[in-house]
């Protein structure tokens, strides 16, 4: 399993990456999560403009085996949904790059830094 060092992680297996402006971030699911889910066939997300609290559900991932909720890693506003998700298998193929789910304006960049780093996530998953 791949666990990039430059991301932060949640116990629910989402990742978040602050972009260069320091207040916008990309969010996706981890390689561990996509592997556990199996073949992803559909992703449903709340609309751009939706304001979320930390841990609030912002969508679902439907796989052949199951359906899983997606939880906001931090509070913020959804700015953009990944257009490539029309082909949901991109999440399996490239979860950390082309398979990102949403771009969001984070309410507090400090909240991102408080999430799990790569080593803590590695310990959580046993990888």
Swiss-Prot record:
Q: Name the needed cofactors.
A: (R)-lipoate
Keyword DNA damage assigned? no
Lineage of the organism:
Bacteria, Pseudomonadati, Chlorobiota, Chlorobiia, Chlorobiales
Subunit: The glycine cleavage system is composed of four proteins: P, T, L and H.
The alphabetized list of GO BP terms reads:
glycine decarboxylation via glycine cleavage system
Q: Which CDD domains match?
A: GCS_H
Cited PANTHER family: GLYCINE CLEAVAGE SYSTEM H PROTEIN, GLYCINE CLEAVAGE SYSTEM H PROTEIN-RELATED
Q: Which UniProt keywords apply?
A: Lipoyl
Give the sites modified to N6-lipoyllysine: 65
Q: What family is this protein classified in?
A: Belongs to the GcvH family.
The chain positions of domain Lipoyl-binding read 24-105
Q: Give the matching PROSITE patterns.
A: BIOTINYL_LIPOYL, LIPOYL
Q: What does this protein do?
A: The glycine cleavage system catalyzes the degradation of glycine. The H protein shuttles the methylamine group of glycine from the P protein to the T protein.
Q: Which InterPro entries match?
A: 2-oxoA_DH_lipoyl-BS, Biotin_lipoyl, GCV_H, GCV_H/Fam206, GCV_H_sub, Single_hybrid_motif
Organism of this sequence: Pelodictyon phaeoclathratiforme (strain DSM 5477 / BU-1)
Q: Which GO terms describe its cellular component?
A: cytoplasm; glycine cleavage complex
Q: How is the cofactor bound?
A: Binds 1 lipoyl cofactor covalently.
Origin, by domain of life? Bacteria
- Protein name per its UniProtKB record: Glycine cleavage system H protein
